[in-house]
Amino acid sequence: MWKSVIYLFVLLLGVIRAEDVKDLRNNEVSIKGRLELSEIDISAYMIPRCSFRLYQIGNYSADKPFHQITRIKDKNGTFEFNHVPINHGVNESTYFVMTPSSRDFNLLPQRVLVEVTNIFNETTGKVEQQLKAFRNYFGREYFPSKDIHFPDKLEEMDALPYISIKMSKMLPFRDYLQQRNVGLLQSGPLAGILNSKWKIAAVITLLALMTFPYLVEKLDPETARAMKEEARKKQREKYVVKEE
């Protein structure tokens, strides 16, 4: 009798696992992320200038690897990859690589290895997906060769409730279009003077010294004559020989 009960229990457990694996074939997951720009507010202008790419690596059950590009959904910086397929079977892992891209910022991490593993929960009797994320950089392998004794391990990062992407620094301004025929005020000696505050100040001072005598002569002729007379007097004194 006990053998029959145990046999039925094992059979029932196998049926449950088989049903879970069967349902898993059409199972899909969503991978969520968030762009954090510290004190910079995410504007409507910035949303289309940031994108996030997810592509599948390693073994995959479909004819070709999964690939999807998404953008920021709101001003909080949240983004999401929907209908992401996973491999069949319990304890099977599916791997994806997520790369952020922005026209305005350098974002970190540069690449994120996402691991989705099917875990059988004995308490609920259902198959659940375990999500992990690992920080990666250009030039480092996702899966090191087994011949390497001490391979570099990827640093694990928080994957729940979302994968955090942060700003490293602002990108420099890039002027892709350059005007071929520029004016005199944009290139040449005159442009060099206009683009320098010190040169402009020197030119203004020189013009003021040159025009000052003419302005005084027009506005106050008597003062102008007195100044000229004083200048002649000093000039004559240079050639006067003092008698002993």
UniProtKB/Swiss-Prot annotation:
Q: Where are the transmembrane segments?
A: 200-216
Ranges facing Lumenal side: 19-199
Q: Please tell me one Gene Ontology term that the record gives under cellular component.
A: endoplasmic reticulum membrane
Instruction: Note one Pfam family from the annotation.
Output: SOP4
Which terms does the UniProt entry file under GO BP?
endoplasmic reticulum to Golgi vesicle-mediated transport; protein transport
Its domain of life reads Eukaryota
Q: What is its main location?
A: endoplasmic reticulum
How is this protein situated with respect to the membrane? Answer: Single-pass type I membrane protein
Q: Where in the cell is it found?
A: Endoplasmic reticulum membrane
Cytoplasmic topology ranges: 217-244
Q: Which residues are glycosylated?
A: N59, N76, N91, N121
Which key words tag this protein in UniProt? Endoplasmic reticulum, Glycoprotein, Membrane, Protein transport, Signal, Transmembrane, Transmembrane helix, Transport
Cleavable signal peptide: 1-18
Looking up InterPro entries in the UniProt record yields:
Sop4
The entry assigns this protein to a family as follows: Belongs to the SOP4 family.
Function (record text): Involved in the export of PMA1, possibly through the monitoring or assisting of PMA1 folding and acquisition of competence to enter vesicles.
Query: Can you say what this protein is called?
Result: Protein SOP4
Organism annotation: Candida glabrata (strain ATCC 2001 / BCRC 20586 / JCM 3761 / NBRC 0622 / NRRL Y-65 / CBS 138)
Gene for this chain: SOP4
